[in-house]
């Protein structure tokens, strides 16, 4: 499974090349202008933390390159409603088709079924995808430091800001985190999964915490599978979590959320 990320990014560049011809930027912008304002993604996370609760970005994910199909019975609208009832702060929905068996339609269905803000979880390589994300209804986008240079991330953060969207910037090591912190977004994701090997270690978040200045919200991502994992993070003042697989493997993902974070 060597360098999955490079394979994914190559496909993404091809998707953007084709997509931006089929739907030119002017067309996507017009679609965006017809939409209501985005839901407040950062505000939803801050409200949970202010109340003393864990802020959970609950992920809707059918499959992954490392695990294959995770959930056969995959109904995004139903899962979104279960997550909302389970106490999620926000949703994350995979829209990548080739590697994660996601789709924009899944994001649209999930968002329509609930009142939670929704992150488009995909591999963004071009500002066109930020407009595309808003056009499909996303309230936030993910920017991955391992996939982008700083100038590109700043451009995409500016586009997201102009559309009223939040940005979650994701890093995996100290060098990436130093780049991530040059963006203005308050949401700093630390991915415990190495996107080049897909190996997971919760120590990644703990090792990087001290580098994150006050005022930023650390979102720990990947590998949160048991209440002990949650307790470890909260004992270290990490109160925001992006969790998918642990919930996708139980019949009612909302109940899974409650049992993991209750």
Swiss-Prot record:
Pfam families: IGPS. The keyword Transcription does not apply. It catalyses: 1-(2-carboxyphenylamino)-1-deoxy-D-ribulose 5-phosphate + H(+) = (1S,2R)-1-C-(indol-3-yl)glycerol 3-phosphate + CO2 + H2O. Its EC number is 4.1.1.48. Transmembrane segments: none annotated. InterPro entries: Aldolase_TIM, Indole-3-glycerol_P_synth, Indole-3-glycerol_P_synth_dom, Indole-3-GlycerolPSynthase_CS, RibuloseP-bd_barrel. Pathway: Amino-acid biosynthesis; L-tryptophan biosynthesis; L-tryptophan from chorismate: step 4/5. Belongs to the TrpC family. PANTHER family: INDOLE-3-GLYCEROL-PHOSPHATE SYNTHASE (PTHR22854:SF2), TRYPTOPHAN BIOSYNTHESIS PROTEIN (PTHR22854). This is Indole-3-glycerol phosphate synthase. The gene is trpC.
């Amino acid at each position: 499974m060597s360098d999955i990320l490079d394979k994914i990014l190559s496909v993404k560049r091809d998707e953007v090349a084709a997509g931006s011809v089929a739907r030119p930027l002017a067309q996507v912008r017009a679609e965006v202008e017809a939409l209501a304002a985005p839901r407040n993604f950062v505000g939803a996370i801050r409200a949970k933390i202010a109340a003393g609760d864990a802020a959970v970005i609950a992920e809707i994910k059918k499959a992954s390159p490392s695990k294959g199909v995770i959930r056969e019975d995959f109904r995004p609208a139903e899962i979104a409603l279960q997550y909302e009832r389970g106490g999620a702060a926000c949703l994350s929905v995979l829209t990548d088709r080739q590697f994660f068996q996601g789709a924009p339609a899944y994001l649209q269905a999930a968002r329509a079924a609930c009142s939670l803000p929704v992150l488009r979880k995909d591999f963004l390589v071009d500002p066109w995808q930020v407009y595309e994300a808003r056009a499909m209804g996303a309230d936030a986008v993910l920017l991955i430091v391992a996939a982008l240079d700083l100038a590109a991330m700043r451009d995409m953060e500016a586009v997201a800001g102009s559309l009223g969207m939040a940005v979650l910037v994701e890093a995996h090591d100290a060098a990436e985190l130093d780049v991530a912190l040059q963006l203005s977004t308050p949401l700093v994701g630390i991915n415990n999964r190495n996107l080049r090997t897909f190996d997971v270690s919760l120590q990644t978040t703990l090792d990087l915490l001290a580098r994150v200045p006050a005022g930023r919200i650390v979102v720990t991502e990947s590998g949160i599978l048991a209440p002990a994992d949650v307790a470890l993070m909260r004992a270290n003042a990490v109160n925001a979590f992006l969790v998918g697989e642990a919930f996708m493997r139980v019949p009612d993902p909302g109940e899974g959320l409650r049992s993991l974070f209750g």
